From Swiss-Prot:
Stated name of the protein: Cytosolic iron-sulfur assembly component 2A
Record-listed Zn(2+) 1 binding positions: 89, 123, 150, 153
Summary of subunit composition and partner proteins: Monomer and homodimer. Component of the CIA complex. Interacts with CIAO1. Interacts with IREB2. Interacts with APAF1.
Tissue occurrence: Substantially enriched in macrophages.
Listed Gene3D superfamilies: 6.10.250.1280, Fe-S cluster assembly (FSCA)
Purpose of the protein: Component of the cytosolic iron-sulfur protein assembly (CIA) complex, a multiprotein complex that mediates the incorporation of iron-sulfur cluster into extramitochondrial Fe/S proteins. As a CIA complex component and in collaboration with CIAO1 specifically matures ACO1 and stabilizes IREB2, connecting cytosolic iron-sulfur protein maturation with cellular iron regulation. May play a role in chromosome segregation through establishment of sister chromatid cohesion. May induce apoptosis in collaboration with APAF1.
Taxonomic lineage: Eukaryota, Metazoa, Chordata, Craniata, Vertebrata
GO cellular component: cytosol; cytosolic [4Fe-4S] assembly targeting complex; nucleoplasm
Single biological process term from Gene Ontology: chromosome segregation
Binding residues for Zn(2+) 2: 89, 123, 150, 153
Family matches, as Pfam families: FeS_assembly_P (PF01883)
Native source organism of the sequence: Homo sapiens (Human)
């Protein structure tokens, strides 16, 4: 019986080691992801709404819980933002998504991939907008428009 118990213990420790659950860094992993998520939130919360004099945080378009960070590998992270427009027919939801993307691409200090979505069920055309704000070519084309670029620049400008 003792032999079986020892074999079981060895097998379990081996499985945990192979799965990465017993690595010293594994316990730090959730804390690191939380820290990265807070870092992301700190950057996006001060983005100004294109129509109103408020920030996205003040309007509750973004919150700490709308940011998720996952590790892709040791040097790169997947950042997922799910924002909530103020009304289901918000005509500027695409512009808000563009502002989020531009600010994070410019300011995030770590290597990342970025996915930005409208929170499910919060906008009448969320699928179309999600496609637009995650399409690199459409984002690049939008930023080539001088009028649109100026609006984005005003929204992402850091407050004094």
């Amino acid at each position: 019986m003792q032999r079986v118990s020892g074999l079981l213990s060895w097998t379990l420790s081996r499985v945990l080691w192979l799965s990465g659950l017993s690595e010293p860094g594994a316990a730090r992993q959730p804390r690191i992801m939380e820290e990265k998520a807070l870092e992301v939130y700190d950057l996006i919360r001060t983005i100004r709404d294109p129509e109103k004099p408020n920030t996205l945080e003040e309007l509750e378009v973004v919150s700490e819980s709308c940011v998720e960070v996952q590790e892709i590998n040791e040097e790169e992270y997947l950042v997922i933002i799910r924002f909530t427009p103020t009304v289901p027919h918000c005509s500027l939801a695409t512009l808000i998504g563009l502002c989020l993307r531009v600010k994070l691409q410019r300011c995030l200090p770590f290597k990342h991939k970025l996915e930005i979505y409208i929170s499910e069920g919060t906008h009448s055309t969320e699928e179309d907008i999600n496609k637009q704000i995650n399409d690199k070519e459409r984002v690049a084309a939008a930023m080539e428009n001088p009028n649109l670029r100026e609006i984005v620049e005003q929204c992402v400008l850091e407050p004094d």
